[in-house]
Amino acid sequence: MRILVEIAYQGNNFLGFQIQQNGRTVQQQFEKLLQRMHKRHVRIHPSSRTDRGVHAIQQYFHFDTELNIPMSQWQYAMNRTLPDDIYVNNVVTVDDDFHCRYDCVGKRYRYKVYQAQHRDPFQSGLKTFIPETLDLDKMNRAAQQFIGTHDFTGFCSQKTEVESKVRTLYQSEIVKTDDGFDYIVTGSGFLYNMVRVLVAFLIEVGKGRHEISDVPKLLESKNRKNVPFTAPAEGLYLEKIYLDENELLKDFGNDIKIHRKKSLQND
């Protein structure tokens, strides 16, 4: 039986989602829990592999089990032993050919920034602090230049090893908040550090160090040295996973192209 689990977690005290040799990760927490339940190793397969310090409001993984536990009991059984910085929101059965990564058709990230004269210790690890005044309207117009299908070689980590760095963004916008702004971006998939590099670039736009007209040139250059900064992980949230292409079409229109993850990596 294949089971799909929806979870949320605060990333401050994790080295990321994926198993690490010597460190606390989200995958490690769940595989330890499942091993205790099954008396054997059980591998989980996530929709996304978030980095160190990145949070998730909605994340999924699947695993296979032979245990005869009522579906209504899985959530309780997991949450009663998980640490406080992880929570299981839902557990359902899925078809045996379902794959959490390959059946993912889109993801939405939100990057949270607060602006103030002084750093707020109660925001530490949850939002990124920027004291400078920024031109949010200009940043939003620059952000919208990324909507569509582009080669994001110049806007991802140089450690990115995937062959194709072409991704499609359906949404890219700056939204003003009471204490700063959020950057919201939805796409077919994302390269290593891509969202954080986009945020860092947009902040430079807001400071007047880049122009809106620079976006097409930087995309065309495919040179990360032209966009050298990366925003901190602490403000980044994996907000939504699209497993249903009809939901994605409803949100962004029937004319968008659906991308399957069998050809996309590093997400």
UniProtKB/Swiss-Prot annotation:
Top-rank lineage group of the source organism: Bacteria
Keyword Transit peptide belongs to the record: no
Keywords: Isomerase, tRNA processing
InterPro entries in the record: PsdUridine_synth_cat_dom_sf, PsdUridine_synth_TruA, PsdUridine_synth_TruA_a/b_dom, PsdUridine_synth_TruA_C, TruA/RsuA/RluB/E/F_N
EC numbers on record: 5.4.99.12
Class in the EC hierarchy, top level: isomerase
Keyword Kinase: no
Oligomer status and interactors: Homodimer.
Assigned protein family: Belongs to the tRNA pseudouridine synthase TruA family.
UniProt cross-references to HAMAP family, sorted A to Z: TruA (MF_00171)
Role: Formation of pseudouridine at positions 38, 39 and 40 in the anticodon stem and loop of transfer RNAs.
NCBIfam families given in the database record: hisT_truA (TIGR00071)
Protein name stated in the entry: tRNA pseudouridine synthase A
Organism: Staphylococcus aureus (strain JH9)
